[in-house]
């Protein structure tokens, strides 16, 4: 079985208590058939800091972008993002988007940074990885306004409504399932995942956050993508092996790579 963790924050895991190093994390994942990881950036400085420790892994791809909750950490620099994202190891622009749940007093600034990053993704022909929270209408509006259907992308860690999902699918976007789908109170999300065609689904951990059942409350890690894969496979009425193959093919199609 070959599973891809399509979204993890490898620089944020607990290397003091739980893991020796990134190689340890990658090996634990591989032992559970999670054989390719997409490591996500949230600021450009943090991306640069993590780059040297990640570039040596053939089974780890990178995404570079500025997260809506982190964009005020340093001045947004579109030229710097463009330069960093041209690296062939970088297969996506992300994680980018809008978050009004934690920060609603800077909507205009969030939107400006988000729009700029979609434009860069289109310029480079690399997909976008979208974070959206309490901002569904504006997220869809901006994806349309900036022609995000050209570069394509994924709604990561999906927690939105059926209406949002249909609009995202209409734009050609993929939907990614995280550990949240296993939570007891996530029936509305499960309903959407049942609706979404299997050819448009990805699986992820969003490590170190949102560990799936039975690890809920503990630090998440890429190895636990297997739990997400098995759970969603059952939801879709297929074997875990078949679902792993489908979601791996989806990952390759969206990000225009062959994984190893």
UniProtKB/Swiss-Prot annotation:
It comes from Haemophilus influenzae (strain ATCC 51907 / DSM 11121 / KW20 / Rd). The keyword Acyltransferase does not apply. PANTHER family: D-AMINOACYL-TRNA DEACYLASE (PTHR46124:SF2). It comes from the Bacteria. Its cofactor is a divalent metal cation. A divalent metal cation 2 binds at residues 95, 131, 156. GO terms for cellular component: cytosol. Pfam families: TatD_DNase. Its EC number is 3.1.-.-. Binds 2 divalent metal cations per subunit. Belongs to the metallo-dependent hydrolases superfamily. TatD-type hydrolase family. GO terms for molecular function: DNA nuclease activity; metal ion binding. Keywords: Hydrolase, Metal-binding. A divalent metal cation 1 binds at residues 7, 9, 95, 206. This is Uncharacterized metal-dependent hydrolase HI_0454.
């Amino acid at each position: 079985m070959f599973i891809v963790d399509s979204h993890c924050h490898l620089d944020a895991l607990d290397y003091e208590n739980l893991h020796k190093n990134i190689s340890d994390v990658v090996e634990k994942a591989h032992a559970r058939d999670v054989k390719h990881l997409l490591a996500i950036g949230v600021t450009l400085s943090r991306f640069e800091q993590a780059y040297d420790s990640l570039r040596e892994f053939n089974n780890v791809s990178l995404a570079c972008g500025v997260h809506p909750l982190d964009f005020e950490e340093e001045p947004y620099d579109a030229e710097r993002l463009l330069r960093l994202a041209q690296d062939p190891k970088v297969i996506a622009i992300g994680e980018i988007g809008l978050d009004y749940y934690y920060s609603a007093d800077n909507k205009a600034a969030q939107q400006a940074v988000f729009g700029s990053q979609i434009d860069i993704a289109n310029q480079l022909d690399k997909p976008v990885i979208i974070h959206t929270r309490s901002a569904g209408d504006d997220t869809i509006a901006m994806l349309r306004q900036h022609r995000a259907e050209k570069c394509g992308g994924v709604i990561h860690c999906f927690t939105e409504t059926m209406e949002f999902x249909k609009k995202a699918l209409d734009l050609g976007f993929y939907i990614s399932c995280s550990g949240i789908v296993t939570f007891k109170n996530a029936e509305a999300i499960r309903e959407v995942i049942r609706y979404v065609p299997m050819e448009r689904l990805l699986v992820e951990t969003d490590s170190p956050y949102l560990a799936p059942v039975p690890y809920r409350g503990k630090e998440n890690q890429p190895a636990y993508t297997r739990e997400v894969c098995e759970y969603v496979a059952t939801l879709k009425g297929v074997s875990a092996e078949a679902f792993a193959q489908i979601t791996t093919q989806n990952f390759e199609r969206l990000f225009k790579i062959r994984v190893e």
